[in-house]
A protein has these predicted regions:
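Bacterial N-terminal signal peptides that target proteins for export
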Residues: 1-9
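Secondary-structure junction motif
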Residues: 144-165
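Extracytoplasmic small-molecule ligand-binding "clamshell" domains
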Residues: 25-99, 108
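Sec/Tat signal peptide C-region and signal peptidase I cleavage site
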Residues: 18-24
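Flexible hinge/capping segments at coil-to-helix
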Residues: 126-143
Length: 166
């Protein structure tokens, strides 16, 4: 069972490793160089996070499993989300192992594996604040989103929708 789990993890990681194509090395190049350079983010628990100054989480566990079977070194670097995809697109890393919303713009630069996790997006308000109960009630309000997030790029779409609906 442990060996088959390792094989499954290896296959999943290898699929992810070559899912980003922008300036990323392919398998023969990685084998020749002897190292797969992987970027993960620093604050996306339970997938990627720091624990006492060390990488931790599900993705670290997957990379540890890959290290058992790969014929090359696996070098994990922890980056803030805001620079993660740019670092892969410029060739500093062979792949990113992280959660990312698939957008048309990102598809022009990256290849993605099939999803293996999903996340929901919510708007959050202060407890007891009854002024915000629908998306429409965001009209005229200041909103914040994560820097580098695909949701940031969708704010003009939200603004247009709110202007149209009043």
């Amino acid at each position: 069972m442990k060996k088959s789990l390792g094989s499954i993890c290896l296959g999943a990681i290898m699929a992810m490793a070559f899912s980003y194509h922008a300036a990323a090395a392919d398998l023969p190049e990685i084998e020749k160089s002897g190292t797969l350079k992987v970027a993960t983010e620093d604050d996306y628990a339970p997938f990627n996070f720091m624990n006492n100054g060390q990488a931790d989480g599900f993705n670290k566990d997957m990379l540890d499993e890959l290290r058992k079977y790969a014929k090359f070194n696996v070098d994990q670097s922890i980056l803030p989300w805001t620079g993660l995809l740019a670092a892969v697109s410029t060739g500093q890393y062979d792949m990113a192992l992280t959660g990312a919303v698939i957008t048309d713009d990102r598809l022009k630069v990256f290849d993605f594996t099939p999803p293996w996790a999903s996340a929901q997006h919510y708007f959050v308000k202060r407890a007891g604040d009854n002024s915000l109960n629908t998306i429409a009630e965001l009209s005229g309000k200041k909103v914040g989103v994560q820097a580098g997030s695909a949701l940031l790029a969708r704010l003009p779409e939200l603004k247009a929708m709110l202007e149209k609906t009043g």
